[in-house]
Amino acid sequence: MKEKTVITNISIVNEGQIVVSDLLIEKGRISKIGSIGQRNDCKQIDGTGKFLFPGIIDGQVHFREPGLTHKGDLHSESKAAVAGGVTSFIDMPNTVPNVLTIDILNEKYRLASEKSLANYGFFLGVNGDNLDEVIKLDTGRLLGVSDDGLYFTKKGNLLADNPETMEKLFANCKSVIAIHSEKEQLVEENEKRYREQYGEEVPVEFHPLIRSEKACYESTKRAIEIANKYGARLHILHLTTEAETHLFRNDIPLIEKNITTEVSVHHLWFSDADYKRLCTLIKWNPAIKTEKDRQGLLKALLDDRIDLVTTDHAPHTLEEKQRPYFQSMSGAPIVQHSLSIMLEFFKRGLISLEKIAEKMCHNPAILYRIEKRGFIREGYFADLCIVDLNSAWTVSKENILSKCGWSPLEGTTFQSKVTHTFVNGHLVYDNGQFNETVKGVALIN
């Protein structure tokens, strides 16, 4: 097998511009961008008419290993990821056991080194039970700490609901603090009101009223106020409301921001009008909200109040999703389709290719200080994906790669397709075929 690859005559989407050029990959890195032409010592890929992106860095996934592997695992979900152009991911701490110690964190890195086709990183979990231990760590060496998913323990340890805990963490933590931001007191009050009216048969259409705009806004506003008090690096996960977007700045570059946020692709794609058709299949926390919110999120993404696009990929079995509203699990698989969704917005004239690369590739690398990735530059790791903007395909059970085997996007036709994905210079995905002999590497040393 030839260790070098040359991609010729491809439109490179990178750092605010699109340039047609050749690109040479050798020893896992981008060694040259410029005129290269045909070379007998290289694998050749003709990029004519196609577009080359930096590999997507997904800053929020739930790949379910260890402990929840009937839903997904590091191999199955990373396979779905690379098929969608995702070359790196950061996994959340709500696996079993929760990632509340360095030993458990290191075990996840070990598992990923054996199983993941993509590069990998993991948040250290933080809640009221392990706060003192987290503060003692050199958190500057972590990708980040997060409470996401840990509120499902029902111990009252959701960070956003504990201002004293936030004060202590924000005053002492040097790394990114990524939080799930909803005011649980308001959520519980809303739930009680609808239970009194409907009992256990509350329709899923009320999910965005139970997990309401007010619950999100008040929580996010308070977290930002406390973070600003200490100069903490606060990142609000999966923003869902237009109101919240006005709490974030766009007058300084990302590298200078301490307060940042993201939007997950499903909150850009779906609105509350879709609950009637898809029911609990699109039950996420925070909830998918109104069309006004959806459009407001897209506007904030375009004007840089929102910094990242992520997936919050969270597979559950179909049986777990199709239960009645209160029993149905929140979350769904979507990592395979995130770039396709954003490219569909491009085809509709709603976003540029350059902005997609900024929000899905460049900015995650900047925010999480991931070295030599997220950009197409000579000397950087060759994490890349090739896209055909004129190759329509339809999501079906036959082409869904997530272990759970279903998607709320089934039946959706996308106009663009990922054709090739490189991870550290290795062609791991090639038009439906996978090279599973090579594995990704850790995003931190």
Could you tell me what each predicted segment is?
Residues 10, 324, 378-444:
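C-terminal cap of metal-dependent C-N hydrolases
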Residues 48-115:
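Metal-associated gating/positioning segment near the N- to mid-region
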